[in-house]
Amino acid sequence: KFDDSKWKQVTLPHAFNEDEAFKLSIEQLTDTVVWYRKNFRIPELKSNQKVFVEFEGVRQRGDFYLNGHYLGRHENGVMAVGFDLTPHIKEGENVIAVRTDNDWMYREEGTNSKFQWNDRNFNANYGGIPKNVFLYVTDNVYQTLPLYSNLKTTGVYVYAQDFDIQGRKATIHAESEVRNDSKATRQFSYQVTILDADGKLMKTFQGDKVTLKAGETKTVKASATLHNLHFWSWGYGYLYTVKTALKD
């Protein structure tokens, strides 16, 4: 068993060279290889469940491991990346490890090209895992994550059309890529719930009943017109929450 007891304890998000911020000019920020390890417990994992991890950003390159299994790499530095942990995760203790490399001169492995924005004259180089990390547990019929770079999935997309500014109304559209990783055909409804800025329910609506064969992936949609909306204007912003769910 690997002994990481003497490693520095940190919380995420974390830039290993964060203490250099505003003390050094950006071209002097430390660039090197840094490792992260996280031990976590999965108390119970059912046969119909899947587990995903999402990193919102690892700079510049990240190599990812779960329980000693190499999951893959990501070289962009500013985009999110995720992995399906299901094949290698287990009930009880698990450990995920990440090797990060924020070399100023980093070149992409496949093309040997540099990233133009990874430049001493442009972008402060805060290395490590400087963005959030999320762990998801889903059913084996699930809405995918917007992590196309590694998982080739597009996730959930919400947008508005048919704006009536004076009437304070618009049509809200939601669509989700849904995948059936079970061994049977499944039927479900796509439900959308919209909450106002105070968390109060504004509207719930559903799309048509959907049938998804085993192994099939499909984009499902639903839309509805909402009234009494708060539109953004100069000096005024208003955030709604949209939740999407699959209902048997």
Protein language model regions, located:
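Accessory beta-strand-rich segments of carbohydrate-active enzymes
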Residues: 31-152, 196-197, 239
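Short strand-edge motifs at loop-to-beta-strand transitions and within beta-strands
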Residues: 36-38, 79-83, 208, 216-224
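Beta-strand-rich binding/interaction modules
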Residues: 66, 167-210, 220
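Solvent-exposed serine/threonine-rich low-complexity stretches and specific carbohydrate-binding patches
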Residues: 71-72, 76, 202-214
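Solvent-exposed, conformationally flexible loop/turn segments
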Residues: 91-92, 169, 213-217
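Surface beta-strand/loop "capping" patches
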Residues: 142-181
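Terminal connector regions
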Residues: 228-248
